[in-house]
Amino acid sequence: MPDAVRRCPEDGFFEGDTCPVCDGAGTHILDGARRRQLSKFVSGALRHFPEDAGIEVDKAGWTGFDALRVAVERQYDWADAAALAGVIATDPKGRFERTGVGNEAGITTAGGRVRAAYGHSVDVTLDGTDDPVPATLYHGTAPRNVDSIREAGLKPMSRQTVHLSESAAAAREVGRRHAADPVVFVVDATAMQSDDRRIVKRGTETYTTDRVSPVYLSLLEK
């Protein structure tokens, strides 16, 4: 269960019991269960079903924060602007990006635009980033997929891009969504980039690419 979200009047939203900047208790915004519930809805609305959620996303995936607030308030009678802003600001994987509010993204509860940083099935084009890419990346999956991946590589499937993780532990956690005992593929990111295969960092620990050919993959030994 994720930590609760609280808000410090000086330093903005944070997760847990005390503000990491001033050690103050802040004001309770959301418990862990509702934080998870709201995060899943916002992720789905921005990535997969904006029209069903009652919002519009542009070609770069952006929608207005205030329009998204209306959508979440319609979905949950307990949700409000502070709950939405808190979920966006404290997401541990950086799933969401907010712009148009300067340095106040972690504090303000109105204005600006929001988008999902990665994971879209709707047709959007995300701009690149200048973040460096590690030499090695990882991908977690179910054991039943090993043979097909060795033969055809990693493909986006229902999403626009393949998602890779910065660490084997993070990849294994992703793999647990598909199997209790997942396997992890090692991705030679250096070789991919040397061959002009584009890899882009999204969020705090996720990297995306169009596909990964088998030549860049090896199975991580347990």
From Swiss-Prot:
Any one GO biological process: tRNA splicing, via endonucleolytic cleavage and ligation
EC number(s) recorded for this UniProt protein: 2.7.1.-
Keyword DNA damage in annotation: no
Record-level Gene Ontology MF annotations: NAD+ poly-ADP-ribosyltransferase activity; tRNA 2'-phosphotransferase activity
Keywords recorded for this protein, A-Z: NAD, Transferase
Domain of life according to the entry: Archaea
Gene3D superfamilies, A to Z: 3.20.170.30, RNA 2'-phosphotransferase, Tpt1/KptA family, N-terminal domain
A Pfam family it matches: PTS_2-RNA
Annotated function: Removes the 2'-phosphate from RNA via an intermediate in which the phosphate is ADP-ribosylated by NAD followed by a presumed transesterification to release the RNA and generate ADP-ribose 1''-2''-cyclic phosphate (APPR>P). May function as an ADP-ribosylase.
PANTHER family reported in the protein's UniProt record: PUTATIVE PHOSPHOTRANSFERASE, TRNA 2'-PHOSPHOTRANSFERASE 1
Assigned protein family: Belongs to the KptA/TPT1 family.
Official protein name in the record: Probable RNA 2'-phosphotransferase
Gene: kptA
